Amino acid sequence: MLTRFTRLRPILQLRYLAQNSHIEEEYFEELEPTGIISSHETSQEPPKRTGFRSQNLSEDADFVENVVGALTDQRAKDVFVVKSEETEMTPYTHKIICSAFNSRQASAISENLRSLLKIDGVSNGSMSHARRSTKRSNGWYVSEVERVQVHVMSEECREKYDLEAIWAGDDRILDEIDEEKQKILLPPRR
């Protein structure tokens, strides 16, 4: 017979780690530049932009495997990983999409992923910058973990938005998007 303590032991361990370890949360705000740019400043060339992908790609692959492992441990299903191309102007090296049975489980997966990665970062000595950018939704939660973007979606949201087809470059989806843009831009018939 299981006692209450043994059934709740993993939860108590997570609570103990969260309470007894120093976890910092960082929130970033973009500040608008103050001041007026003079004409002689605009004639100068902008500074060279360094790429987002200057870190080791094998470390990124290992990190993505850890994130996918954490998602499967949380019972996420249909995990789909998309590697961003070098030509894309995105700070993310990988995008991960997974499904949950309902929106409540999607919220729990997103929150548990964030807390597990923070606890893992504290134990390894490196702070993992994990933040959840979706506060309330109808089953779609987006988390940004270092250079990986994680989408946890309910089945209905995943079927509705079909991000895999858009990111994979499915021509059928891209043609539908172009048709919708044309409908919007055409003047109404009289």
Curated annotation (Swiss-Prot):
Give one Pfam family, short name only. RsfS
GO terms (BP aspect)? IRE1-mediated unfolded protein response; negative regulation of ribosome biogenesis; negative regulation of translation
Q: Where are the transmembrane segments?
A: none
Q: Which family does it belong to?
A: Belongs to the Iojap/RsfS family.
- Residues in the signal sequence: none
This entry carries the following GO cellular component terms, namely: mitochondrion
Q: Name one GO molecular function term.
A: ribosomal large subunit binding
Its recorded name reads Uncharacterized protein K12H4.2
